[in-house]
Amino acid sequence: MISVNDFRTGLTISVDNALWQVLDFQHVKPGKGAAFVRSKLRNLRTGSVQEKTFRAGEKVEKAHIENRRMQYLYASGEAHVFMDNGTYEQIELGEKQIERELKFLKENMEVAIMTYQGEVLGVELPNTVELQVTETEPGIKGDTASNVTKPATLETGLVVQVPIFINEGEMLIINTGEGKYVSRA
């Protein structure tokens, strides 16, 4: 059992006989009444996203998920193919199962496949990934105001805000948890 006060992004829990992954959470302390935790959860079996509210201090069951190291090979229509590096076994995951992770996946990338009692649930990404900028506006010389950003489209289709000095073709390090620019690669 784990307290909802200990929620963190990516945590897997079992609530109402379903497996959920915490996508987002917020501790709320209203001026009047008891504190609570508002969370956004994704059902690992169906891919549906739900918002649930828990009382502060409420206990939920932590799901023990096993991670298998695999390599992302390619997309085949709606299916995405992964290969176990040790056994060369290939598995296919549907687009709905890995919808959020698709923005960060590149061919031949090493990832962890989450399984629960032999059932494949989804993909766990590394904390950061290197992606190439495919489209962005050119930076304007002399624009030195602090924290000036512009949108940049990356090779996977992900759009992130980057500093004004970033140009097309550059490799960037992106935080997969927040989907934000970290630095140049």
Swiss-Prot record:
Keywords attached to this Swiss-Prot or TrEMBL record, sorted alphabetically, are: Cytoplasm, Elongation factor, Protein biosynthesis
| Superkingdom of the source species | Bacteria
InterPro entries from the UniProt entry: Elong-fact-P_C, NA-bd_OB-fold, Rib_uL2_dom2, Transl_elong_fac_P/YeiP, Transl_elong_KOW-like, Transl_elong_P/YeiP_cen, Transl_elong_P/YeiP_CS, Transl_elongation_fac_P
> What SMART domains does the annotation carry?
EFP, Elong-fact-P_C
In the record, biological process GO terms are: peptide biosynthetic process
- Where would one find coiled-coil regions in this protein? none
Q: In which pathway does it act?
A: Protein biosynthesis; polypeptide chain elongation
**Is Acyltransferase a UniProt keyword of this protein?**
no
Which PROSITE patterns does the record match to this protein? EFP
Molecular functions per Gene Ontology: translation elongation factor activity
Keyword Protein biosynthesis listed? The answer is yes
Where is it localised?
Cytoplasm
- Principal place of residence: cytoplasm
User: What GO cellular component is one of the record's annotations?
Assistant: cytoplasm
Q: What does the function comment of this entry state?
A: Involved in peptide bond synthesis. Stimulates efficient translation and peptide-bond synthesis on native or reconstituted 70S ribosomes in vitro. Probably functions indirectly by altering the affinity of the ribosome for aminoacyl-tRNA, thus increasing their reactivity as acceptors for peptidyl transferase.
Protein family: Belongs to the elongation factor P family.
Name the UniProt record assigns to this protein: Elongation factor P
Q: Which gene encodes it?
A: efp
